[in-house]
């Protein structure tokens, strides 16, 4: 079991607390340090506008080893009308990642939100099946060999662990999951295929138990699910990240990962707990924080990220670097 240096000691903790912002250690890369501990990446989300912001881009290039498109690969961005695809934003991110030697996590293929009305209005099983297959195949074949992993289905569970009510579950039942994963495997056999959801930060949650139960069943039925991604919560309160990741790994998937990580207040202790959890679970391949700077966060008022609104490294960033 690997553990980072604890922050419980009074001297170190007082030192961190004494400064609101500690200047970034120029020689350090949080990705390189994490990979040195046997992981694949420490990543962030981005898109064209953020990558064209010189301050943001410099940090992405120097510190992070993986990129997840924040919005440019969602259904409404890629296929706003049936059969009409718009790849400009997604191409920009994929090209940037290739040029700068970054892994890419494709996000996301099937999701109930940011879904065009033309998809939401489908009521026929055969029609929806073909729409899902065409959407996944077109996108994945375009980026075949460029995407390390895809979030194939996203946020499909309710808090009680049952399937969320969506056009996909209404029309196809749970079979939409099989359809999506089998289509994705055929489109790019080498990409890792993930199921992604939030509020999986405790093994005791009904949602976590539901995820574990369904994934075990789908794997037993031959559905090609490679991994589970946990969207850890945007708050600062007694996380139980390690036991939760262990529970997800127990399903039999080959990989688990943490994504969309932003913690309200960005305390060093909470960020270190998540990092330690991933280090302690051998199948956890990486962590993705949901943005670079608080300025650009969708939750900017809660200051949840590793860099402040002036693009300066915060205590949590430096604590991770120091500990790794």
From Swiss-Prot:
Q: What does this protein do?
A: Endo-1,4-beta-xylanase involved in the hydrolysis of xylan, a major structural heterogeneous polysaccharide found in plant biomass representing the second most abundant polysaccharide in the biosphere, after cellulose.
Could you tell me which PANTHER family the record lists for this protein? ENDO-1,4-BETA-XYLANASE C, GLYCOSYL HYDROLASE
The name this protein goes by in its record: Probable endo-1,4-beta-xylanase F3
Tell me the protein family, please. Answer: Belongs to the glycosyl hydrolase 10 (cellulase F) family.
Alphabetized SMART domains for the sequence: Glyco_10
Q: Which UniProt keywords apply?
A: Carbohydrate metabolism, Disulfide bond, Glycosidase, Hydrolase, Polysaccharide degradation, Secreted, Signal, Xylan degradation
Q: Which organism is it from?
A: Aspergillus flavus (strain ATCC 200026 / FGSC A1120 / IAM 13836 / NRRL 3357 / JCM 12722 / SRRC 167)
Enzyme Commission code(s) on record: 3.2.1.8
């Amino acid at each position: 079991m690997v553990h980072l240096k604890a922050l419980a000691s009074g001297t170190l903790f007082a030192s961190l607390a004494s400064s609101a912002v500690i200047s970034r250690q120029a020689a350090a890369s949080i990705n390189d340090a994490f990979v040195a501990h046997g992981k694949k990446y420490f990543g962030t989300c981005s898109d064209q506008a953020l990558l064209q912001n010189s301050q943001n881009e410099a940090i992405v290039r120097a510190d992070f080893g993986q990129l997840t498109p924040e919005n440019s690969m969602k259904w409404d961005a890629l296929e706003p009308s049936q059969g009409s695809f718009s790849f400009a934003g997604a191409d920009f991110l994929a090209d940037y990642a290739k040029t700068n030697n970054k892994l890419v996590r494709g996000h996301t293929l099937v999701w109930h939100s940011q879904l065009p009305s033309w998809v939401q209005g489908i009521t026929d099983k055969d029609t929806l099946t073909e729409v899902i297959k065409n959407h996944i195949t077109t996108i994945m074949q375009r980026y075949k060999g460029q995407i390390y992993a895809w979030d194939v289905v996203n946020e499909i569970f309710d808090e009680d662990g049952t399937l969320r009510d969506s056009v996909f579950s209404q029309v196809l039942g749970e079979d939409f999951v099989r359809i999506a994963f089998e289509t994705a495997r055929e489109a790019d056999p080498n990409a890792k295929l993930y199921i992604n959801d939030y509020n999986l930060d405790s093994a005791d949650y009904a949602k976590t138990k539901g995820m574990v139960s369904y994934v075990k069943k789908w794997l037993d039925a031959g559905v090609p699910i490679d991994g589970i991604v946990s969207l850890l919560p945007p708050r600062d309160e007694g996380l139980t990240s390690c036991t939760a990741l262990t529970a997800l790994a127990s399903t039999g998937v080959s990989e688990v990962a943490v994504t969309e990580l932003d913690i309200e207040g960005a305390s060093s202790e909470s960020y270190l707990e998540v990092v330690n959890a991933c280090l302690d679970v051998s199948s956890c391949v990486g962590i993705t924080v949901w943005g670079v700077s608080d300025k650009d966060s969708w939750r900017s008022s809660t200051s949840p990220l590793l860099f402040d609104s002036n693009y300066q490294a915060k205590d949590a960033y430096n604590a991770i670097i120091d500990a790794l």
